[in-house]
């Protein structure tokens, strides 16, 4: 039996990892990241459900439906981090702990990337560690869920 079920959401253009701007995002593919996440989830005894979409409404719908089966959300909303009030409001409206992750350090990049609509409604944000950002985020959300009653 799994301790928790975590929803992992990848936003727009993350399906192009390994091809898109490797100087910023590295050579790792989304399949590589998903494989690492599945291995880590198994090692720590949690179940993960993984989805990627380039469409804001699809991500909002996935967040809305997560309250029925997930205890936490790990999200890299990609460019929607900086533009989507809809994703921010969806997270705010479901009362499920959420960790925001980014491969690159969004604060060392272009000025328009410095603002996150998601960070204020997330329990935390991890950025700048490449694919490790996802693994750190998964560990963080699970640790939070285990200890939130303390």
From Swiss-Prot:
Keyword Amino-acid biosynthesis listed? The answer is: yes
Tell me where on the tree of life, at the top rank, the source sits. Bacteria
Q: Name one GO molecular function term.
A: 3-dehydroquinate dehydratase activity
Q: Where does substrate bind?
A: 76, 82, 89, 103-104, 113
Looking at the keywords, is Endoplasmic reticulum present? no
**Pfam assignment, any one:** DHquinase_II
Q: In which pathway does it act?
A: Metabolic intermediate biosynthesis; chorismate biosynthesis; chorismate from D-erythrose 4-phosphate and phosphoenolpyruvate: step 3/7
Where does the record place the catalytic residues? 25, 102
Q: Which GO terms describe its biological process?
A: amino acid biosynthetic process; aromatic amino acid family biosynthetic process; chorismate biosynthetic process; quinate catabolic process
Identify the EC number(s): 4.2.1.10
User: Which PROSITE patterns does the record cross-reference, listed alphabetically?
Assistant: DEHYDROQUINASE_II
Sorted alphabetically, the keyword list is: Amino-acid biosynthesis, Aromatic amino acid biosynthesis, Lyase
Supply the CDD domains for this chain: DHQase_II (cd00466)
Question: According to its UniProt record, which reaction does this protein catalyse?
Answer: 3-dehydroquinate = 3-dehydroshikimate + H2O
Instruction: Show which residues form the site (Transition state stabilizer).
Output: 20
- Into which family does the record put it? Belongs to the type-II 3-dehydroquinase family.
Q: How does it assemble?
A: Homododecamer.
Primary role: Catalyzes a trans-dehydration via an enolate intermediate.
What HAMAP family does this protein's entry cite? AroQ (MF_00169)
The protein, known as = 3-dehydroquinate dehydratase
* Organism from which the protein derives: Trichodesmium erythraeum (strain IMS101)
């Amino acid at each position: 039996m799994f301790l928790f079920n975590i929803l992992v959401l990848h936003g727009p253009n993350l399906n192009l990892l390994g091809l898109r701007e490797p100087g910023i995002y590295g050579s790792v593919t989304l399949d590589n990241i998903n494989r690492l996440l599945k291995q880590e989830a198994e090692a720590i005894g949690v179940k993960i459900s993984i989805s990627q979409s380039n469409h804001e409404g699809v991500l909002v719908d996935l967040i809305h439906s997560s309250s029925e089966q997930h205890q936490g959300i790990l999200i890299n909303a990609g460019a929607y981090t900086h533009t989507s009030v809809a994703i921010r409001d969806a997270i705010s409206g479901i009362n499920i702990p959420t960790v925001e992750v980014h491969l690159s350090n969004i604060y060392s990049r272009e000025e328009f990337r410095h603002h996150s609509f998601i960070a204020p409604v997330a329990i935390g944000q991890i950025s700048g560690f490449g694919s490790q950002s996802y693994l750190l985020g998964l560990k963080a959300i699970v640790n939070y869920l285990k200890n939130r009653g303390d």
